[in-house]
Amino acid sequence: MSQISSNLLRNTVQNGKFGCLKNSIQCKHTAANPLEKIRERLESGPSFQDFVQNPSYNRDDWTDYEGKLRREKGENDRLRLPPWLKTKIPMGKNFSRIKDQLRELKLATVCEEAKCPNIGECWGGGEHGTQTATIMLMGDTCTRGCRFCSVKTARVPPPLDPAEPTNTASAIASWGLDYIVLTSVDRDDLPDGGSNHIAATIREIKRQNPRIFVECLAPDFRGDLECVKVVAQSGLDVYAHNIETVEALTPFVRDRRARYRQSLDVLRSIKEINPSMITKTSIMLGLGETDEQIEQTMKDLRSVGVDCLTLGQYMQPTKRHLKVIEYVTPEKFKHWETRGNELGFLYTASGPLVRSSYKAGEFFITSILKNRAEEAERRKEAAGGQDTKTEQT
């Protein structure tokens, strides 16, 4: 489970507007002209700053901020939270309604388990009035113990709930969403890592609403690519798996069973299974990584065909977890957004409160998915017209 990775699913598309993490996709197979058309189309939509800028601060708050942003080696004191990371206390009717509904259906959310800082905005509906919560599949207990993640752990969590696929699909159907994001805990105690359970949930969601777009943030399944294949062939639209951090820090940040190269192999295999599948990953900043290491990680991700990249600030969930080494400024996050676009990601979502599925991401991905569907329909109609001509001849 991840913070940036698992940190939530959120605000989704309703009538073409929605919300969660601004991502995008760049398939190396995409031709230049279609790519430009997509970018032009997105220009008319909401900008990244419309979604992720915290209304409680302005640019002067961080350009004039004189607080300490980085812990030096050997220092034990925790850094004070800078103004751009402070969020409102969650409340309101929408927030309470979603919380009650999730409890009634016995569904877990990564929003709560991972202590996401955006929970009030997403559950409350935010500026655009669309609300949702990231459904965390396979229970609320993970078999891994990553040092950044607050999801509880156990060697053998409770058995899977056979009603979860149906309950999840029913909740999503009642929200009337066009785009939904799922995530899950790791279940190393299961022979298939839970891949068939995840696939069954996706199929049930699609059965109840064939027009909905589904994104799933899935585990690495211990590197078992057959399990990856099960999820990739379930009818999924966007397959996400998080790299989490740079290679040098992976052994200290993630569970020992989660390896950097293994995650790259998972992301590579998704494209080999289905070249048109949109892939997505996330990186946490503030754990002590260098600019050179971030740059190399981004290049590694492009080399395996990753389409969407998100970068966000690591925030220590409890005193038992890794301390923040550095609070990265919004200006630096903007630099990585620009660099990601230069490296070929169709869109890079980069900001202090960005999580793997936060705010405007679904808008951009939905635009591309709809564009692809329209292109496929036009090709089909053109082929049908050609067949008619041939028959007449």
Curated annotation (Swiss-Prot):
Pathway(s) of this molecule: Protein modification; protein lipoylation via endogenous pathway; protein N(6)-(lipoyl)lysine from octanoyl-[acyl-carrier-protein]: step 2/2
KW Iron (keyword) present: yes
Start and end residues of each Radical SAM core domain: 127-346
Enzymatic class: transferase
Superkingdom, taxonomy of origin: Eukaryota
Pfam families: LIAS_N (PF16881), Radical_SAM (PF04055)
Catalytic activity: [[Fe-S] cluster scaffold protein carrying a second [4Fe-4S](2+) cluster] + N(6)-octanoyl-L-lysyl-[protein] + 2 oxidized [2Fe-2S]-[ferredoxin] + 2 S-adenosyl-L-methionine + 4 H(+) = [[Fe-S] cluster scaffold protein] + N(6)-[(R)-dihydrolipoyl]-L-lysyl-[protein] + 4 Fe(3+) + 2 hydrogen sulfide + 2 5'-deoxyadenosine + 2 L-methionine + 2 reduced [2Fe-2S]-[ferredoxin]
Enzyme Commission designation: 2.8.1.8
UniProt cross-references to InterPro entries, sorted A to Z: Aldolase_TIM (IPR013785), Elp3/MiaA/NifB-like_rSAM (IPR006638), LIAS_N (IPR031691), Lipoyl_synth (IPR003698), rSAM (IPR007197)
CDD domains: Radical_SAM
Keyword terms, alphabetized: 4Fe-4S, Iron, Iron-sulfur, Metal-binding, Mitochondrion, S-adenosyl-L-methionine, Transferase
GO molecular-function term, one example from the UniProt record: metal ion binding
The keyword NADP appears for this protein: no
SMART domains reported for this sequence: Elp3 (SM00729)
GO cellular component: mitochondrion
Subcellular location: Mitochondrion
Family the UniProt entry places it in: Belongs to the radical SAM superfamily. Lipoyl synthase family.
HAMAP family noted in UniProt: Lipoyl_synth (MF_00206)
Note: This protein may be expected to contain an N-terminal transit peptide but none has been predicted.
NCBIfam families recorded: lipA (TIGR00510), PRK05481.1 (NF004019), PRK12928.1 (NF009544)
Protein name per the record: Lipoyl synthase, mitochondrial
Species per Swiss-Prot/TrEMBL record: Aedes aegypti
Lineage of source species: Eukaryota, Metazoa, Ecdysozoa, Arthropoda, Hexapoda
